Each structure stands twice: as structure tokens, then as C-alpha cells.
Regions:
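Short beta-strand and adjacent tight-turn residues that come in two discontinuous sequence segments
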Residues: 62, 84, 215, 232-233
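A ligand-binding cleft/hinge motif common to bilobed small-molecule-binding domains
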Residues: 88-91, 224, 230-245
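Conserved residues at the C-terminal ends of beta-strands
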Residues: 20, 37, 85, 104, ...
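Extracytoplasmic ligand-binding site segments that recognize negatively charged/polar headgroups
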Residues: 78, 83-227
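Early extracytoplasmic/lumenal segment of secretory-pathway proteins
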Residues: 24-91, 221
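Short, low-complexity disordered leader/linker segments with a strong preference
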Residues: 1-32
């Protein structure tokens, strides 16, 4: 079962120093390097792209924004296009890691709904283009929990979910958002006392032995294989999960 919670937005952006108009790696080497979340694209599409453009796609994936950021910051890899979540775009802009886009070269931007333009993480729409939007929710196995899960606070209640049973996202932004909602606070609060309270709740959840693991893509397999009672994951993946289990 799934309970819908908060929305997420993934955004395409170009790394500074990689593609510069027609002078980037795709133009000079015939290869475009893309860094994206796992399970987000059908790689068969890359063959069609190569047939139409003559440019080969070098495609790599990551499991969290933080893992992506660390790899990019190390300077050990070069990518042309990355697709992080909204909040990470702000950080990359602030640190000068993204190039401004030439929207004359992106005609399909005209098809992006107005509500997804000029977002707070890129208010002037200079560095990014929305790629996908969706919702995140609580997914649980009714045969493995003590009582039905009906609210966010249940993920922190041992009497409801048991021990070693809950899968939490392996990134601070989403974990703190979940805890804030469990406490009845806005997920975007800037109140230091509320954020501290959320962090304390997450620490207690771990100390109480409720959390089985902090993971990302592994949530799909663990829930499908009945390895965990509950997890927080993407609503679209839930539809696939119920087909498999």
C-alpha cells in the first residue's frame, strides 16, 4: 500500500567547463556524457539518439544527490549533462559548477508548463530545465506491520512497524523532510528549533532499532522481496512493485 506524501522534481543541467555551445565534448568527440539516477531512462533510446545525431551517449548512474555531488566535486570524472534533484541545483549554482543554458538550442523548452519555470532553486531559469516530476510516498507490506500505517509519524513508532523494519532514504534532505512532516512542520521550514527536533527524531528512530537501512534504489528490490515492512519511495515505482508482489 502507498500513502502519497511530498513531491520531487528532477532537473537537467550542464556542468561548467563541459559543454559550451557547440564547443563541448559532444561536438568535438562525438560523445555526450550523461549522469542520471538509476532506472530513469530506457537505454534503447540512446541508439535512436545516435542514429539521429551521430553522437554517442556515455551513460552513468548514481543512487543519491550526495553521491553524485561528491564524485563531481572530486574532479575525477567529467560529465556533460547531469540530472539532480531540485535542491542540489541550488548548491551547484552557488558553487559555480553549472553553465548557463542557451535556450535557443532547446526549442522544446516551450513545452515546459509555466508552473515548473522560474523555480526557487533556479529563479531566473538560467541553468536548468525540468526533466520529471512526481510524488514520494510511504510503501508498506500489510502482512509485515503490526498495524496499518496511516501517517508519517507511524514510521517512527515501534508499536506500528516493529524493529529493523523501515527503509529510509539515504540523503539528509528527504530524511529531514519526512521527520518534519511526522512532527507536523513544513518540509521547507527554516526554523532552527524545528529542524533540530526533526534531527533528534531521526536519531531516536535509529537508536530504537526501527531503521533496517538507509538506501535508495535498493528499496525497490527489498520491498518487492519482502525484506522490509515499510519504506519511503517513489509512487511510480509502487505501481511496478504491486505487479511483482
Amino acid at each position: 500500500m502507498v500513502k502519497r506524501i511530498f513531491s520531487f522534481l528532477c532537473v537537467g543541467a550542464i556542468l561548467a567547463g563541459m559543454l559550451a555551445g557547440c564547443g563541448g565534448t559532444a561536438a568535438t568527440n562525438g560523445v555526450v556524457s550523461v549522469y542520471n539516477w538509476g532506472e530513469y531512462m530506457d537505454t534503447d533510446l540512446f541508439d535512436e539518439f545516435t542514429e539521429q545525431t551521430g553522437i554517442r551517449v556515455n551513460y552513468s548512474t548514481y543512487e543519491s544527490n550526495e553521491a553524485m555531488y561528491t564524485k563531481l566535486r572530486s574532479g575525477s570524472v567529467n560529465y556533460d549533462v547531469i540530472i539532480p534533484s531540485d535542491y542540489m541545483i541550488s548548491r551547484l549554482i552557488d558553487e559555480g559548477m553549472l553553465m548557463k543554458l542557451d535556450f535557443d538550442q532547446i526549442p522544446n523548452y516551450a513545452n515546459i508548463d509555466e508552473q515548473y519555470r522560474n523555480m526557487i532553486y533556479d529563479p531566473n531559469n538560467e541553468y536548468s530545465v525540468p526533466y520529471t516530476w512526481g510524488t514520494t510516498g510511504i510503501i508498506y507490506n500489510p502482512n509485515m506491520v503490526q498495524q496499518p500505517i496511516t501517517k508519517w509519524a507511524d514510521l517512527f513508532d515501534e508499536e506500528k512497524v516493529g524493529t529493523h523494519s523501515v527503509l529510509m532514504f539515504d540523503n539528509s534532505r528527504d530524511c529531514i523532510a519526512i521527520a518534519l512532516m511526522a512532527l507536523g512542520y513544513d518540509i521547507n521550514t527554516t526554523d532552527a528549533s524545528q529542524i533540530t527536533e526533526a534531527v533528534d527524531l531521526l536519531v531516536k528512530q535509529k537508536q530504537d532499532g526501527i531503521v533496517q537501512a538507509y538506501v535508495m534504489d535498493q528499496i525497490f528490490d527489498k520491498m518487492t522481496n519482502n525484506e522490509a515492512a515499510a519504506g519511503v519511495y517513489y509512487a511510480g515505482d509502487y505501481l511496478i512493485m504491486v505487479e511483482d508482489n
